[in-house]
């Protein structure tokens, strides 16, 4: 019996597409799905005429694979992954490799790696970005685990990943759960990107008064620039011309303004808090989705609470350009926060992440792919120990040149009652990061006053506590 090179468990659309991608690149595939009907449908249509072998039990599936077996699990994160692993364990042999390609919590990946190690089974936690289209035609892959396991899988990964000017969009991330952690932060950055674009759209539509055709033109032009050329700007431009065939109204205007989320943005915020890394733009993006979801409450509030009534009286063309500058400055800050989180996680968990390589593999295939990532890669290649992207000469100069427009846009939004939480959070991050003295000296004095938490001084070494109450009483 001829054995297959690679196996995929889970035939939802991502599993189907990545299986077809692997087969198209010359690796015979075996597939298994819990539901036989799903497997039958896949084999009858999309896999017809391909070198794909269907299995209808895990025993049959495992027996159809050459050793060491390479099995990609594409099922829902959490307990379903654990269930598949438990079912596979008695069927596999030492040296076989299980790859989790879902959006698993990185600590689950660490736990599974440790649990499988005594059995001799190898485990790879791999972030996969690019959605359905990327899975089929070339995603960005973020595999974490042992280096030897990655090297064994790299001939396949290098073929199926998106291809850019400097190679395939895959690299060895690091040990344990690092691959899933990097994918989580990628998704957090994606949240920030999408919220910043939404705020730019809101300003252009409701301050500048642009219609759908004009919005399409502006975003299309922005997508031709070095700084904003990206997949998300491209699809944003493509959304505006689509007219609902029934109402003849731009479809975007008919979509309910309540954004969903699957949890990776929230995870990013949670881990940042645990590691003590400020990511206010990404946090604002998560909060914006939460606020959008209480739509009925917002609609009721809009009839009770009033805001400014003023209209924008400035030059529309100049305002559009200022919004572009504000969007780019905010984007730099959002990515600076994401990279700072990766840097801290790398040090905390001893992952030795190469941040320049992270930027490189995000250049193609993934949702945040953008020309701007070349600049990030260059910054970290020139200085791998760079503490923050805001300190990179190019980004520093860009913000210095454009900060007046950035500030003007946020002031205008505030005057007109247009919420721009991610724009504002980005500017606050920039202003806080560049200050040599923040007002937290008062915060520390307050903590010492009510809780004797002590404080340090700028003029002498040591830790100090003051009996504030007697001093205050004496002043009365």
Question: Language-model segments: which ranges?
Answer:
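Short beta-strand "acidic-cap" motif of Rossmann-like dinucleotide-binding folds
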Residues: 29-31, 125, 276
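Small-residue-rich helix-loop
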Residues: 222, 347-380
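C-terminal amphipathic alpha-helical interaction region
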Residues: 400, 405-476
């Amino acid at each position: 019996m001829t054995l297959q090179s690679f196996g995929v468990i889970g035939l939802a659309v991502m599993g189907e597409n990545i299986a077809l991608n692997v087969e198209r690149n010359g690796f015979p595939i075996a597939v298994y799905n819990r539901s036989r009907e799903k497997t039958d449908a896949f084999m009858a249509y999309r896999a017809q005429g391909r070198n794909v072998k269907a299995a209808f039990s895990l025993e049959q599936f495992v027996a159809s694979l050459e050793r060491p077996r390479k099995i990609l699990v594409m099922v829902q994160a959490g307990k379903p992954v654990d269930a598949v692993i438990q079912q596979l364990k008695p069927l596999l042999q030492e040296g076989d490799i299980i790859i989790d390609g879902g959006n698993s919590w990185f600590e689950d990946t660490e736990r599974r790696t440790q649990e499988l190690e005594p059995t001799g089974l190898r485990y790879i936690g791999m972030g996969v970005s690019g959605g359905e289209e990327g899975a089929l035609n070339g995603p960005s892959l973020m595999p974490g685990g042992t280096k030897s396991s990655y090297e064994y899988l790299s001939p396949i990964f290098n073929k199926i990943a998106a291809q850019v000017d400097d190679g395939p969009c895959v690299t060895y991330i690091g040990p344990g759960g690092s691959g899933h952690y990097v994918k989580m932060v990628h998704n957090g950055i994606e949240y920030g990107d999408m919220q910043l674009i939404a705020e730019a759209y809101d300003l252009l539509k409701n301050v500048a008064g642009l219609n759908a055709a004009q919005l399409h033109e502006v975003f299309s032009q922005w997508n031709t620039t070095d700084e904003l050329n990206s997949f998300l700007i491209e699809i944003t431009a493509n959304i505006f011309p689509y007219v609902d065939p029934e109402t003849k109204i731009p479809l975007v205007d008919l979509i309910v303004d309540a954004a969903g989320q699957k949890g990776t943005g929230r995870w990013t915020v949670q881990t940042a808090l645990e590691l003590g890394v400020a990511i206010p733009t990404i946090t604002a993006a998560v909060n914006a989705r939460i606020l959008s979801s209480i739509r009925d409450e917002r609609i009721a509030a809009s009839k009770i609470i009033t805001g400014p009534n003023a209209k924008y009286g400035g030059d529309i063309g100049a305002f559009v350009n200022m919004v572009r500058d504000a969007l780019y400055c905010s984007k730099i800050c959002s990515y600076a926060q994401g990279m700072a989180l990766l840097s801290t996680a790398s040090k905390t968990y001893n992952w030795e992440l190469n941040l320049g390589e992270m930027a490189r593999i995000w250049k193609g295939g993934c949702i945040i792919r953008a020309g701007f990532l070349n600049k990030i890669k260059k910054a970290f290649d020139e200085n791998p120990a760079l503490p923050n992207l805001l300190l990179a000469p190019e980004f520093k100069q860009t913000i210095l040149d454009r900060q007046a427009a950035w500030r003007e846009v946020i002031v205008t939004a505030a005057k007109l009652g247009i919420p721009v939480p991610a724009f504002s959070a980005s500017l606050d991050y920039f202003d806080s990061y560049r200050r040599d003295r923040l007002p937290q000296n008062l915060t520390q004095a307050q903590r010492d006053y009510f809780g004797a938490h002590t404080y340090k001084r700028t003029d002498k070494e040591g830790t100090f506590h003051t009996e504030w109450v007697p001093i205050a009483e004496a002043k009365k």
